[in-house]
Amino acid sequence: METPLDVLSRAASLVHADDEKREAALRGEPRIQTLPVASALSSHRTGPPPISPSKRKFSMEPGDEDLDCDNDHVSKMSRIFNPHLNKTANGDCRRDPRERSRSPIERAVAPTMSLHGSHLYTSLPSLGLEQPLALTKNSLDASRPAGLSPTLTPGERQQNRPSVITCASAGARNCNLSHCPIAHSGCAAPGPASYRRPPSAATTCDPVVEEHFRRSLGKNYKEPEPAPNSVSITGSVDDHFAKALGDTWLQIKAAKDGASSSPESASRRGQPASPSAHMVSHSHSPSVVS
């Protein structure tokens, strides 16, 4: 059975190993090894063996499960920390004299017990003793130097062409609204209001306004518009229907001419031309196309 002196000596050795582990982490020396803690503690113990082996085995079973879980955690953390610990601050890989004097068991137990003691804040040389370890993606992105981030020059931020929304400077404006090509109530030019108006030779407009109307109305927006389209009748109605209906229109026209000539011939003979008789003759006539 262990005496209080053995317990105190083991605790003092763990504290001393923890301090040396912090110094080694600050120097950037990789000392993390995944040696089982149970075998290291059993071989390094200076006290007498337990009196009751069965009782000792029963009491260590829950602890062994916890140590196995901790060993898995240590192995995962060691894979994360090794790339950072392999880079020393000054490129000096020489060992400390105190590190050379320690036994291999102490070198294995010290980093393992320091991780079990929740001292995970001194793994990186650039971090302080009390700063938490940042393993998130945002912190890694924030730790990048500012020179690597893409920066835009003032020339790239500006647009390649002037915007039609922004106003030009007061010195560049040589005209007022009455001289601009858009129609409004303040126009002094006579004639109907239109968007396309012949420009005045004595006035010049804002280049921003010119660019706006050139994009909206085309390159030749200053040219006068042609006269509004008026309805022009070319040809006669007969020509129009002859082109549209063809032979059908000729048949209709012949039927109309025959119908109009029949009342005139009847009146010349002295026979009355009643409308009912005319309608009956039309209804029985096979040549009439309604």
Curated annotation (Swiss-Prot):
Q: Does the keyword Phosphoprotein apply?
A: yes
Q: Specify residue ranges for compositional bias: Low complexity.
A: 272-290
The answer to whether the entry has keyword Acetylation is yes
Region of interest (Disordered), ranges: 17-65, 85-106, 140-161, 254-290
Compartment(s) where it occurs, according to its Swiss-Prot or TrEMBL record: Nucleus
Q: List the biased-composition ranges (Basic and acidic residues).
A: 17-30, 92-105
Q: SMART domains from the xrefs?
A: TDU
Listed InterPro entries = TDU_repeat, VGLL4
Recorded GO cellular component terms are: nucleus
Compositionally biased spans, kind Polar residues: 150-161
Q: Which family does it belong to?
A: Belongs to the vestigial family.
Q: What is said about its interaction partners and assembly? A: Interacts with TEFs. Interacts with IRF2BP2.
Know the name of this protein?
Transcription cofactor vestigial-like protein 4
Its source organism is: Homo sapiens (Human)
